[in-house]
Amino acid sequence: MAKSNKANDLIKVTLVRSTIGRIKAHRASVAGLGLRRLNQTVEVQDTPANRGMINAVSYLLKVEA
């Protein structure tokens, strides 16, 4: 099996809905992904931990590969 390229191991995540009124764990997941403001986009490593945070708050995010 060939090693994957580092550029392919990034996921683009954009916060499209506010965290106001959300449960504390979901706000923590958004912060853990490095998102602070609406429409802010970050690139995170494709790891199981980041995938779990993205799945938990997927209703707040737009995700691109």
From Swiss-Prot:
Domain of life of the native organism: Bacteria
GO terms, molecular function: structural constituent of ribosome
One Pfam match: Ribosomal_L30
Single GO cellular component term: cytosolic large ribosomal subunit
Gene Ontology biological-process entries: translation
Key words of the record: Ribonucleoprotein, Ribosomal protein
InterPro entries: Ribo_uL30_ferredoxin-like_sf (IPR036919), Ribosomal_uL30_bac-type (IPR005996), Ribosomal_uL30_ferredoxin-like (IPR016082)
Gene3D superfamilies assigned: Ribosomal protein L30, ferredoxin-like fold domain
Record text on subunit structure and interactions: Part of the 50S ribosomal subunit.
Cited NCBIfam families: rpmD_bact
Protein family: Belongs to the universal ribosomal protein uL30 family.
Protein name: Large ribosomal subunit protein uL30
UniProt organism field: Methylobacillus flagellatus (strain ATCC 51484 / DSM 6875 / VKM B-1610 / KT)
High-level lineage: Bacteria, Pseudomonadati, Pseudomonadota, Betaproteobacteria, Nitrosomonadales
Gene: rpmD
